[in-house]
Amino acid sequence: VLTKMVADITPAHDTKLQELLRLIADKIEHPINEGNRRVLVFSAFSDTAEYLYEHVSTYLKETYGCDTALITGSIDGRTTIAGFRATLNNVLTCFSPLSKGRDVLMPGSTADITVLIATDCISEGQNLQDCDYMVNYDIHWNPVRIIQRFGRIDRIGSRNACIQLVNFWPDLTLDDYINLKP
């Protein structure tokens, strides 16, 4: 019964996913810093991150030829780069090659990850300032976590003139739907 009820809910009807795809496409087509097409997408949930990777990676590869990666901390990383060993360090190095020293760590490598989808397993202690655009696909219950996420790209030593941070806020009608009192 439940399967039939959700059968019509497809990625094409997922307005939040469609908005994310639109934002990423706009960023790729109109970089805010010349030549920088990188986007970091955070989700609080590994299932959501997997869902996003499944749909975002396919769209970006087919539409722009861009590579996407996934890091959740509970599985080995994944990427659309054929034959790439998607360890945490390899993925982060190819997503932020200048700050992570790709030329030193992976001499001769041209592997380049344009979009990284991740959980909070990388929200602390990672320098990803090659990226200038970060999306919170869902908001963590702890506001400090949001600040930590932003801190991955808003760092001293960034070559970006400006950065952009985007939040997807929960639907406010949800409070009424579940009878939540102010």
Language-model features: locations:
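A short beta-strand-to-loop transition that corresponds to the Sensor-1 phosphate-sensing loop
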Residues: 43-46, 74, 118-122, 150, ...
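SF2 helicase motor core recognition
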Residues: 102-111, 116-131, 151-158
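A short acidic (Asp/Glu
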Residues: 49-55, 80, 129-130, 146-147, ...
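A conserved SF2-helicase RecA2
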Residues: 144-182
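Generic structural signal for small/hydrophobic residues in well-ordered secondary structure
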Residues: 20, 41, 128, 149-151
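Amphipathic, heptad-repeat alpha-helical coiled-coil/stalk segments that mediate oligomerization
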Residues: 84-95, 99, 110, 114, ...
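Conserved Helicase C-terminal RecA-like lobe
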Residues: 1-112
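A short beta-strand element within the Helicase C-terminal
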Residues: 117, 126-139, 163-167
